UniProtKB/Swiss-Prot annotation:
Membrane spanning stretches: 21-41, 82-102, 128-148, 165-185, 213-233, 254-274
PROSITE patterns in the cross-refs: TLC (PS50922)
GO biological process terms on file: ceramide biosynthetic process
Name assigned to this protein: Alternaria stem canker resistance protein 1
Annotated source species: Solanum lycopersicum (Tomato)
GO cellular component terms listed in the entry, alphabetical order: endoplasmic reticulum; endoplasmic reticulum membrane
Biological role stated in the UniProt entry: Mediates resistance to sphinganine-analog mycotoxins (SAMs) by restoring the sphingolipid biosynthesis. Could salvage the transport of GPI-anchored proteins from the endoplasmic reticulum to the Golgi apparatus in ceramides-depleted cells after SAM exposure.
Length: 308
């Protein structure tokens, strides 16, 4: 562990360079790393944690029962996603919060000095964020298909992961990483609260679940429904035109403009779909006098749970 800390400390994370295609090999590395890490955590951490949190100190528990195993698996999924979303949110904030584009969207496309897109260099820590997140969502396509509990929004999840991977790869290659890093920071923050709420619900801590679901709904609405379209998409639709030389690179410029905005708007449509589900849950919470009911995204009865 000390050796890893020493290596990390010796790396110049502020070093800048242009993105290169061969950098994407690290995306594939993380795509292979995440399932291995999840398997280890599932077996040696999350399984025991789930049993302790759900069943307490009971020594005899029929975990072979369908409902008991189903609840354990759901807890483990949420624990894994909590670990990822918390880590990537902290990484995204550490990468972006001190950069000028974190507060001024004009710097998505220009600066420092006279440098403008597409000649924007990337710091090594920004490249790390991109490979880390890209690897996770690439792995998540297969995890959603073959590993995790299949829920009501299964198709939306697959579309989301494919769209996100496409955005990450294309924005990295074509120099849109500054705005991409802020998109990652906006997206993963609310999911931290959601996974805490779900783990609390599975564990029977209803008050904690109610509090964190309320926080999740508030953060989701603020970041994905308000900030995302009026900050991110506004910049890609309007401010990008100031630096995108369509006359010089007519074909490439038009393709970049419409492809990126189409993918970003696709994410917004998914946000609105999930926002509708959240509103339904808020309504149920109000009708049940402050307590959240079962997740309306829970698995359909016709689908089998994953087996560990």
């Amino acid at each position: 562990m000390k050796n890893l800390d020493h290596i990390a400390a010796s790396v110049d994370w502020e070093k800048e360079s242009l993105p290169e295609y061969q950098d994407l090999i690290f995306l594939l590395f993380f795509a292979l790393f995440f399932p291995v890490l999840r398997f280890i955590l599932d077996r040696f951490v999350f399984e025991a944690l789930a049993k302790r949190m759900i069943f307490g100190k009971k020594t005899v528990v029929n975990i072979n029962g369908r409902e008991e195993r189903k609840k354990i698996n759901k807890f483990k999924e949420s624990a894994w996603k909590f670990v990822y979303f918390l880590s990537t949110e902290l990484l995204a904030l550490s990468v972006t919060c001190n950069e000028p584009w974190f507060t001024d969207s004009r710097y998505f496309w220009a600066g420092p000095g006279d440098v403008v897109w597409p000649n924007l260099k990337m710091k090594l820590k920004l490249k790390l964020l991109y490979m880390y997140a890209g690897g996770f969502y690439f792995y998540s396509i297969f995890a959603t298909l073959y590993w995790e509990t299949r829920r009501y929004d299964f198709a939306a999840q697959i579309i989301h992961h494919v769209t996100t991977v496409s955005l990450i790869v294309l924005s990295y290659v074509y120099g849109f990483a500054r705005i991409g890093s802020v998109v990652l920071a906006l997206h993963d923050g609310s999911d931290v609260f959601m996974e805490i709420a779900k783990m609390s619900k599975y564990s029977g801590f209803d008050l904690i679940a109610d509090i964190f679901f309320s926080l999740f709904a508030l953060v989701f609405t603020s970041l994905r429904i308000i900030c995302y379209p009026f900050w991110i998409i506004r910049s890609t639709c309007y401010e990008l035109l100031y630096v995108l030389d369509i006359q010089k690179e007519r074909t490439t410029g038009i393709i970049l403009y419409f492809v990126f905005n189409a993918l970003l708007i696709c994410l917004l449509v998914l946000h609105l779909f999930w926002f509708k589900i959240i509103l339904r849950m808020v309504k149920n919470q109000i009708l049940s006098r402050g307590h959240i009911t079962d997740d309306v995204r829970e698995d359909s009865e016709s689908d089998d749970d994953h087996k560990d």
